[in-house]
Amino acid sequence: MLTADDKKLLTQLWEKVAGHQEEFGSEALQRMFLTYPQTKTYFPHFDLHPGSEQVRGHGKKVAAALGNAVKSLDNLSQALSELSNLHAYNLRVDPANFKLLAQCFQVVLATHLGKDYSPEMHAAFDKFLSAVAAVLAEKYR
């Protein structure tokens, strides 16, 4: 459960991320593909080389979806319903992969934001990403 302080920290964090969505999102995807190569199977039609248009475009979509979720912290299920349907019914992505991408996104933020990514902000974002992963996995039950 996200506290009022968590929500405040997440809003502050996303203000720092907003101008870098494509960069951070694509870097998180690239990191996931390198660290967890089995995740590449969900992208057979993508050029997965670093810096490819497809990875950059999808990274931007991922980060934008997270940004929309930050704007809807009190109603994540509704905000992510369409994405949950897409990943569960059409793409059939194993929900374990959401946590892998979340870990990679954390590393990207820590790398780029440095001291601006405080332990409290990290903890709030971790709770948020866990909540997002849970919502995305809801339709699998």
UniProtKB/Swiss-Prot annotation:
One of its GO terms (cellular component) is blood microparticle. Belongs to the globin family. Heme b binds at H58, H87. The gene is HBAD. Residues 1-141 form the Globin domain. One of its GO terms (biological process) is hydrogen peroxide catabolic process. Involved in oxygen transport from the lung to the various peripheral tissues. Signal peptide: none annotated. GO terms for molecular function: haptoglobin binding; heme binding; iron ion binding; organic acid binding; oxygen binding; oxygen carrier activity; peroxidase activity. This is Hemoglobin subunit alpha-D. Red blood cells. The lineage of its organism: Eukaryota, Metazoa, Chordata, Craniata, Vertebrata. Keywords: Heme, Iron, Metal-binding, Oxygen transport, Transport. Heterotetramer of two alpha-D chains and two beta chains.
